């Protein structure tokens, strides 16, 4: 059977077809409408499988699934359908033709013609062995998680090496740490992170190592080379960005210079930069009330080695962490051990040296930090779905240590920071954990938010994560609302001034991350667009700034990036094939012949693919795209000046679902009705297979509501009637045409939706909120176009009802506040547990995000160019390997 014949017989129907790809072990299996293993033999026996058709087949004993193709031949009597009693009902459209081959007969918006013609016919995606290997490698990261994997710090190892023997004998307690220092000197005589040279870091590490070796009279040649390096490079600190100064540098470096002087090291003690650093230390010390140092845990505990001559160590022992450390700093703890010989300090250091082969990181543990940042990276790269169970375990681990006042980078930390707290808050909240806004209260003072309680500074990454967390606010969370405003203003100022660099991390493209957050906040961020953007921003060589530079291999590594790129390209290839089907369907419905209709097949499919990108959501995407196209042409039909009497006949035909009623209507009305009629019937058949029951009446009801509301607006326009704001919104929230798209798609989200769910208050509430958000956003950006068509908008009505409002801008600001309040409520409803499945509520949320993205600055749906770049990124431009 030829493709054209199949399309004709299908009468505007379309089903899902999948390229061959692997469904990886451990991934939730949700393939509504896809052939099940039990159906495969049935299909083969009846010779109903086409060479290009995809079926779901399991690998015996492996627990994995893959998509395979069928043999040649089709039962001619089936006319494109399976015989009665089979498990599926309709063959997918074959994929022999590329876009190039059918471009001459299928029509899309002119803006996409050139792009579609340039698109190459990609090879079918096959079982990707490499992807399986990368997934397993990442799973090993999860399995091996303990208290965190982190690179070594010469600085901290040097302080540990300085600890004298605890039995009173002459010599070091940890002599193998001295050997590690000798073995890890770099070729130019310094110590530090080999992949990046920063003056502050190299000088600080080198000075600490030279002092340790000189203290015990070992490694004379290493000491000499280290001193030569210091003599030549101390001045280079003047050229360094102050943001790259190690943690506590102004406190610890002058103290080490005093130690070096006492050892007789030949260094330029009078250098201007050293005098400046010493002056900064004095300034900071004057601000530190020593009585408070002994009373409350502060970040100063992390740098006690810089105060070892000033503090009372016995008093400080009361602030020791449970694991024996001082705020998880090996250097600070080693210094405490020198003065107190405390057994808990010794145990902490000894365990570190065993784990890390006689060296130390700059901080340990980092268990919460590692888990949170790893989950965040996997999500932003778009590959978190492969690790749902592992991610859940990670977040449960974090929640175990969650406190009302927030968290730090390590479990049971006595000091919390806004960066880790914000990251945890956002991830926990969006995964359904109960977290409250009060966790940010200690970081808020005098209208500003800070990194640590009691401090007066901000970091770009800390405010970046605070901004992301604050965007998930619920109704009534005033502190989070303040955090959202403050962090957004802070980030905007930094970005405008080209100051997007950070004191905690040196990353590939922090400015780009900030720009995306400002342009597409959570309400407007389409998942696949975020993934594609972050693929360019993710740095496999990102380096954090602690007391020395360090790396987190479970957070930034090449395997994440390889899997993310392969996954994006795999999904994109599938999406291109599906887009071909949507364009074919649009042509078979003859919608191109409708003079009044915008051609938006590509944009409609993009909206679905950018939010429901997973391969198993294929049928949901195709239903979404078809319904979106239908709402577009219906909207144009009702808006282009069609006589109201004709509209009433059209509405009656839809209401009764009777094609005979359109016999007297113009040809274009007939084309539109039959396209709607046949497509909804086809979707009803597909939904029957997905839901195992008839939902046709629900589907017809969605379209009946839509065209009834559109007719009401047409009658208002004809009569010149201006409704009240509430009266308008009651009708316009339906006429914005989101409900048929969303609610039809829900039947293909992987869950059975019974009548109790569809009739529930929760179900109708989330749809109402989405409708309200969509209508107001559409009105704000489209009011001029609507006015030219004789239609009224919420902006116009609001101004007429509130004559005291001095300007259109103020009216819009009020309406945007309504949108914001609705989004807060929608966020709450989506993230809390209700009878409506979470995957279904996610589709509601995604529609609200789509409306924000499309109507952010302009009417992006009607515009020919506003969304072009984003569409190309998601659908047409593969990620370079």
Curated annotation (Swiss-Prot):
It holds the Pfam family Terpene_synth_C. It catalyses: (2E,6E,10E)-geranylgeranyl diphosphate = ent-copalyl diphosphate; ent-copalyl diphosphate = ent-kaur-16-ene + diphosphate; ent-copalyl diphosphate = ent-beyerene + diphosphate; ent-copalyl diphosphate = ent-sandaracopimara-8(14),15-diene + diphosphate. Binds 4 Mg(2+) ions per subunit. A motif (DDXXD motif) lies at residues 635-639. Keywords: Chloroplast, Isomerase, Lyase, Magnesium, Metal-binding, Plastid, Transit peptide. One of its GO terms (biological process) is ent-kaurene biosynthetic process. GO terms for cellular component: chloroplast. A motif (DXDDTA motif) lies at residues 417-422. Mg(2+) 1 binds at residues 417, 419. Mg(2+) 2 binds at residues 635, 639. Pathway: Secondary metabolite biosynthesis; terpenoid biosynthesis. It is found in: Plastid, Chloroplast. Mg(2+) 3 binds at residues 635, 639. InterPro entries: Isoprenoid_synthase_dom_sf, Terpene_cyclase-like_1_C, Terpene_cyclase_plant_C1, Terpene_synth_N, Terpene_synth_N_sf, Terpene_synthase-like, Terpene_synthase_metal-bd, Terpenoid_cyclase/PrenylTrfase. Its EC number is 4.2.3.19, 4.2.3.-, 4.2.3.229, 5.5.1.13. Mg(2+) 4 binds at residues 778-779, 786. Disruption phenotype: Lost ability to convert geranylgeranyl diphosphate (GGPP) into diterpenoids. Belongs to the terpene synthase family. Bifunctional copalyl diphosphate/kaurene synthase involved in the biosynthesis of labdane-related diterpenoids (LRDs) natural products such as ent-beyerene, an antimicrobial compound. Supports the conversion of geranylgeranyl diphosphate (GGPP) to ent-copalyl diphosphate (ent-CDP). Also catalyzes the subsequent cyclization of ent-CDP into many diterpenes, including ent-kaur-16-ene as the major product, and ent-beyerene, ent-sandaracopimaradiene, ent-kaur-15-ene (ent-isokaurene) and 16-hydroxy-ent-kaurene (ent-16-alpha-hydroxy-kaurene) as minor products. The Asp-Asp-Xaa-Xaa-Asp/Glu (DDXXD/E) motif is important for the ent-kaurene synthase (KS) catalytic activity, presumably through binding to Mg(2+). This is Ent-kaurene synthase CPS/KS, chloroplastic. It comes from Physcomitrium patens (Spreading-leaved earth moss).
């Amino acid at each position: 059977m030829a493709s054209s014949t199949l399309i004709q017989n299908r009468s505007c129907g379309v089903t899902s077809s999948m390229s061959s790809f692997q469904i990886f072990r451990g991934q939730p299996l949700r393939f509504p409408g896809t052939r099940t293993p039990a159906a495969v033999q049935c299909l083969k026996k009846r010779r109903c499988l086409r060479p290009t058709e995809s079926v779901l087949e399991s690998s015996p004993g492996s627990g994995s699934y893959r998509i395979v193709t069928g043999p040649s031949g089709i039962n001619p009597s089936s006319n494109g359908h399976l015989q009665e009693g089979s498990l599926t009902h309709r063959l997918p459209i074959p994929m022999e033709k590329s876009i190039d081959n059918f471009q001459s007969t299928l029509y899309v918006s002119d803006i996409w013609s050139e792009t579609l013609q340039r698109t190459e016919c990609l090879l079918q995606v096959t079982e990707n062995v490499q992807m399986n290997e990368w997934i397993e490698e990442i799973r090993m990261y999860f399995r091996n998680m303990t208290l965190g994997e982190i690179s070594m710090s010469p600085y901290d190892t040097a302080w540990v090496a300085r600890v004298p023997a605890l039995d009173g004998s002459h010599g070091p307690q940890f002599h193998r740490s001295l050997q590690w220092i000798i073995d890890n000197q770099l070729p130019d005589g310094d110590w530090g992170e080999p992949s990046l040279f920063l003056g502050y870091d190299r000088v600080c590490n080198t000075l600490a190592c030279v002092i340790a070796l000189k203290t015990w009279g070992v490694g004379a040649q290493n000491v000499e080379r280290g001193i030569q390096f210091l003599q030549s490079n101390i001045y280079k600190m003047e050229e360094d960005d102050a943001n790259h100064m190690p943690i506590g540098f102004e406190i610890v470096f002058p103290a080490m210079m005093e130690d070096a002087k006492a050892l007789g090291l030949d260094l330029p003690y009078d250098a201007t930069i050293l005098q400046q650093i010493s002056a900064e230390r004095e300034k900071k010390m004057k601000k530190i009330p020593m009585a408070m140092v002994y009373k409350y845990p502060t970040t100063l505990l992390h740098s006690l080695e810089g105060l070892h001559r000033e503090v009372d160590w016995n008093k400080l022992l009361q602030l020791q962490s449970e694991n024996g450390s001082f705020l998880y700093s090996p250097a600070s703890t080693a210094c405490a051990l020198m003065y107190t010989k405390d057994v808990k300090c010794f145990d902490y250091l000894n365990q570190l040296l065993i784990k890390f082969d006689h060296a130390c990181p700059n901080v340990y543990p980092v268990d919460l930090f590692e888990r949170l940042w790893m989950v965040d990276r996997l999500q932003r790269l778009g590959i978190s779905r492969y690790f749902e169970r592992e991610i859940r375990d990670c977040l449960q681990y974090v929640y175990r240590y969650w406190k009302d006042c927030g968290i730090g980078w390590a479990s049971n930390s006595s000091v919390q920071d806004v960066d880790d707290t914000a990251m945890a808050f956002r991830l926990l909240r969006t995964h359904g954990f109960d977290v409250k806004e009060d966790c940010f209260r200690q970081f808020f003072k005098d209208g500003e938010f800070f990194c640590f309680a009691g401090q007066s500074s901000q970091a770009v990454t800390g405010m970046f994560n605070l901004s992301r967390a604050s965007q998930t606010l619920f109704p009534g969370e005033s502190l989070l609302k303040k955090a959202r405003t403050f962090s957004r203003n802070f980030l905007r100022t930094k970005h405008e001034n080209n100051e997007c660099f950070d004191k905690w991390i040196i990353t590939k493209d922090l400015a780009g991350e900030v720009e995306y957050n400002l342009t597409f906040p959570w309400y407007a961020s389409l998942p696949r667009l975020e993934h594609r953007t972050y693929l360019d921003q993710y740095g496999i060589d990102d380096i954090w700034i602690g007391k020395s530079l360090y790396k987190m291999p479970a957070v930034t590594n090449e395997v994440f990036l390889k899997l993310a790129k392969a996954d994006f390209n795999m999904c994109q290839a599938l999406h291109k094939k599906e887009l071909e089907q949507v364009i074919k369907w649009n042509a078979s419905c003859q919608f191109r012949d409708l003079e009044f209709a915008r051609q938006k097949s590509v944009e409609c499919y993009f909206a679905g693919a950018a939010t429901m990108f997973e391969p198993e959501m294929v049928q949901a995407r195709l239903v979404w795209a078809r319904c979106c196209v239908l709402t577009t042409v219906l909207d144009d039909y009702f808006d282009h000046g069609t006589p109201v009497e004709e509209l009433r006949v059209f509405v009656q035909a839809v209401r009764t679902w009777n094609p005979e009623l359109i016999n007297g209507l113009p040809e274009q009305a007939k084309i539109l009705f039959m396209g709607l009629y046949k497509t909804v019937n086809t979707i009803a058949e597909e939904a029957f297979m997905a839901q195992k029951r008839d939902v046709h009446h629900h589907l017809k009801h969605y379209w009946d509501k839509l065209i009834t509301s559109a007719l009401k607006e047409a009658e208002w326009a004809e009569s010149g009637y201006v409704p009240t704001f509430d009266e308008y919104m009651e009708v316009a929230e339906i006429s914005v045409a989101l409900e048929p798209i969303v609610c039809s798609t829900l039947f293909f989200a992987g869950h059975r939706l019974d009548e109790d769910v569809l009739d529930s208050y929760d179900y109708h509430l989330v749809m109402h909120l989405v409708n309200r958000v969509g209508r107001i956003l559409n009105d704000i950006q489209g009011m001029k176009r609507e006015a030219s068509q004789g239609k009224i908008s919420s902006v116009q009505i609001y101004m007429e009802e509130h004559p005291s409002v001095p300007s259109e801008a103020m009216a819009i600001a009020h309406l945007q506040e309504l949108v914001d309040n609705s989004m807060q409520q929608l966020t709450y409803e989506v993230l809390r547990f209700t009878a409506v499945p979470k995957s279904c509520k996610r589709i509601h949320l995604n529609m609200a995000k789509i409306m924000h993205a499309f109507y952010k600055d302009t009417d992006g749906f009607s515009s020919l160019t506003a969304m072009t770049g984003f569409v190309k990124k998601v659908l047409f431009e593969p990620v370079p390997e």
